[in-house]
Amino acid sequence: MAKGKDVRVTVILECTDCVRNSVNKVSTGISRYITQKNRHNTPNRLELKKFCPYCYKHTVHGEIKK
């Protein structure tokens, strides 16, 4: 049986390069991925290297609030 709250929670990962660059110029978009993380194993913010189709390279995608 499960104890307490759900251990797995859905999180959104957003490209950090697109967010920084969109302030200075008009960007075509911001890359976002939806994934799940285990709250017990990773209590802090999740950061993964993923491919950004707007930057055309692999960049760090950080967890954002919903």
Curated annotation (Swiss-Prot):
Alphabetical keyword list: Chloroplast, Plastid, Ribonucleoprotein, Ribosomal protein
GO CC annotation terms, alphabetical: chloroplast; ribonucleoprotein complex; ribosome
GO BP terms in the entry: translation
Disulfide bonds: none
Subcellular location per the Swiss-Prot or TrEMBL entry: Plastid, Chloroplast
Major subcellular site: plastid
Gene Ontology molecular function terms on file: structural constituent of ribosome
Pfam families cross-referenced by the UniProt entry: Ribosomal_L33 (PF00471)
InterPro entries listed in its UniProt record: Ribosomal_bL33, Ribosomal_bL33_CS, Ribosomal_bL33_sf, Ribosomal_zn-bd
Alphabetical list of PROSITE patterns matching this protein: RIBOSOMAL_L33
Family membership: Belongs to the bacterial ribosomal protein bL33 family.
Protein's name in the database: Large ribosomal subunit protein bL33c
Species, as recorded: Coffea arabica (Arabian coffee)
